[in-house]
Amino acid sequence: MEKKQLKFIDLFAGIGGMRIPFEELGGKCVFSSEIDKHCQRTYEANFGEMPTGDITKLSADSIPYHDLLLAGFPCQAFSQGGRKQGFQDERGQLFFQVAKILNDHRPQAILLENVKGLRGHDKGRTLQMILYVLEKLNYVVSWKIISATDFNLPQKRERIFIVGFQDKNNKNLIFDFPKPIELTAKVGDLLEKEVDEKYTITDRMWEGHQNRKKAHRKRGNGFGFSLVNRNSSYTRTISARYYKDGSEVLVEQANKNPRVLTPRECARLQGFPESFVIPVSDCQAWRQFGNSVPVSVIRAIAQKMLSYIDLTEQQKEFKKVDLDQVITQKKKQLYPEDYQEQFIQKELALL
């Protein structure tokens, strides 16, 4: 049977960091979704299409056939920098929108990305819920925490990657994640040679950074700015709040205050190509690259995933599951005390 072109969809697409490697490898994006208007602008500037907006308003028939689903579902609900509310946060609930699309379409493969904090969030119960739902949708799932430094990007950025394949004939296929490669790139390789003076921080800002770092050190945490130079092996994680939370990566400069990274340098630290267009303000660009994925890591995973996907296969009939029932069953197992309290309240109401 003739091999067909890989078709994939790009959900919570951001600025397309997950899309780039799969297109490089011959895949075709047949649908994209991103609600942020500034990200939409960057996405359109680079891929020539405006992503669909609110994923919660999508109908099953509005999404075309696809072999692969990509989703970097919102991480703020699980991250160290956020409030860590998980599924109690509306953004955490958006994973279930992904599950709904999987239930409607059952693509052969999935690739999900989130912050490292997802692993231990709510004592591991959040990840347990995600894996349980995917398994009930007949996916054999593997996950791993990978740093951008593992694939030659000089940024210490650890993220969790969840890969799943439809379980055919109960083979229980286990995905073999790509092996790390040697970090040969240095921060200096990615820094611009000439930088506008506007990126140098003021005396007041520099004093504020130093005072905040001292305060964080007294409290025993690792927040606060970090200084790098051209010889540094890597930077810390660039965050979506790069321009306002005091945890900036700052670049040393001779005989003057340090400077912030330029948007192009942030793009390079995330592995975006030089041809990638940045049509938005610096503040929006910092936010977008801070929220994005390390493209080199996605590329390595994509190369592995393609060897597991059968592009000669025709989609088979499948039976949809009752997602509400699946989720409720797992919640009862993970949070028995909550359901016991609800039962008591119902009994008291009958008295």
Swiss-Prot record:
CDD domains annotated for this entry? Answer: Cyt_C5_DNA_methylase (cd00315)
EC number, UniProt record? 2.1.1.37
What does the record list as GO biological process? Answer: DNA restriction-modification system; methylation
Highest taxon in the source lineage: Bacteria
GO MF annotations, alphabetized: DNA (cytosine-5-)-methyltransferase activity; DNA binding
Give the keywords, sorted: DNA-binding, Methyltransferase, Restriction system, S-adenosyl-L-methionine, Transferase
Looking at the record, the residues that make up the SAM-dependent MTase C5-type domain are: 6-312
Q: Name one Pfam family in it.
A: DNA_methylase
Q: List the active site.
A: C75
Instruction: Give me the reactions it catalyses.
Output: a 2'-deoxycytidine in DNA + S-adenosyl-L-methionine = a 5-methyl-2'-deoxycytidine in DNA + S-adenosyl-L-homocysteine + H(+)
Bilayer-spanning residue ranges: none
| Family label | Belongs to the class I-like SAM-binding methyltransferase superfamily. C5-methyltransferase family.
What's the protein name? Type II methyltransferase M.DsaV
Organism of this sequence: Dactylococcopsis salina (Myxobaktron salinum)
Q: What is the lineage of its organism?
A: Bacteria, Bacillati, Cyanobacteriota, Cyanophyceae, Synechococcales
